């Protein structure tokens, strides 16, 4: 039986501002990435998200991003490798404290937004992220863009297990990277098209790019976004589609 992880970015509310559909999406995913206060989230939201994840027996990961609340961590920043190391270590350490306080164990780290995209093509940034994980806890998994040489090499250097990630509702460029969110065709808004893409990646090992080319993808985890208008319905639809196609959903081991 084919096995795949379904992950989702949660814990993105901040103070009085609610974001996402955390409670409704949790039943349909096997792992979550919790915002750690830099691009979204706050201490109370972090604690509450961890507790809810444990109630659903969902694997917990840290989702560190750039310190950019207004831009939601989706804007590139001109920072040094040392700054990236500090940002990541600080954030994953904070989430780990909440997980331990709740009696749980953190499973992975997945960079957020611009930090993720920059790391996928910038070896220095990917190296800084992997180094922070190694110093924090080398048994933590690193979720990174499938086929990214920067992520692959950084994980190998620090002896960290890389979980290669693909995206359900994002389009891909010819080089295998994600189409920038600044482009009109960055998101797949048709649910059936998104599910078709996911099944191609999981069952057949490739994705169709915006240029009409096929790119090989070894997807071990699929990211769902939890903040769209139909995010919950989409998550449930993918969950049920996997079940119908005899695809087992579980967190990486």
UniProtKB/Swiss-Prot annotation:
Protein's name in the database: 5-oxoprolinase subunit A
GO molecular function, one term: ATP binding
Function per UniProt: Catalyzes the cleavage of 5-oxoproline to form L-glutamate coupled to the hydrolysis of ATP to ADP and inorganic phosphate.
Entry keywords, A to Z: ATP-binding, Hydrolase, Nucleotide-binding
One GO term of the biological process aspect: carbohydrate metabolic process
Species per Swiss-Prot/TrEMBL record: Bacillus cereus (strain 03BB102)
Family matches, as InterPro entries: Glyco_hydro/deAcase_b/a-brl (IPR011330), LamB/YcsF/PxpA-like (IPR005501)
Gene3D superfamilies from the UniProt entry: Glycoside hydrolase/deacetylase
A Pfam family matched in the record: LamB_YcsF
Family: Belongs to the LamB/PxpA family.
PANTHER family cross-referenced by the UniProt entry: 5-OXOPROLINASE SUBUNIT A, UNCHARACTERIZED PROTEIN YBGL-RELATED
Lineage: Bacteria, Bacillati, Bacillota, Bacilli, Bacillales
Subunit structure: Forms a complex composed of PxpA, PxpB and PxpC.
Catalytic activity: 5-oxo-L-proline + ATP + 2 H2O = L-glutamate + ADP + phosphate + H(+)
Gene: pxpA
């Amino acid at each position: 039986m084919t096995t795949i992880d379904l992950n989702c970015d949660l814990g993105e509310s901040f103070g009085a501002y609610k974001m996402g559909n955390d409670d409704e999406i949790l039943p349909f995913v096997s792992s979550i990435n919790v915002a750690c206060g830099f691009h979204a989230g706050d201490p109370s939201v972090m604690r509450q998200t961890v507790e809810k994840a444990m109630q659903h027996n969902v694997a917990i990961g840290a989702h560190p991003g750039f310190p950019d609340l207004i831009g939601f961590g989706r804007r590139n920043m001109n920072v040094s490798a040392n700054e990236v190391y500090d940002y990541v270590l600080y954030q994953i350490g904070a989430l780990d404290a909440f997980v331990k306080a709740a009696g749980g164990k953190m499973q992975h780290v997945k960079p957020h937004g611009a930090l993720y995209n920059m790391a996928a093509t910038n070896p220095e940034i990917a190296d800084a992220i992997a180094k922070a994980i190694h110093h924090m806890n080398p048994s933590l998994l690193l979720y990174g863009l499938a086929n990214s040489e920067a992520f692959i090499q950084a994980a190998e250097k620090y002896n960290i297990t890389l979980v290669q990630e693909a995206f359900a509702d994002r389009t891909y460029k010819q080089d295998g990277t994600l189409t920038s969110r600044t482009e009109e065709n960055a998101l797949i808004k048709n649910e059936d098209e998104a599910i078709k893409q996911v099944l191609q990646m999981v069952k057949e090992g490739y994705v169709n790019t915006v240029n009409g080319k096929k790119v090989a993808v070894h997807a071990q985890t699929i990211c769902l976004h939890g903040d769209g208008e139909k995010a919950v319905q989409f998550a449930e639809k993918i969950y049920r589609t996997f079940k119908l196609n005899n695809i087992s959903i579980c967190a990486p081991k």
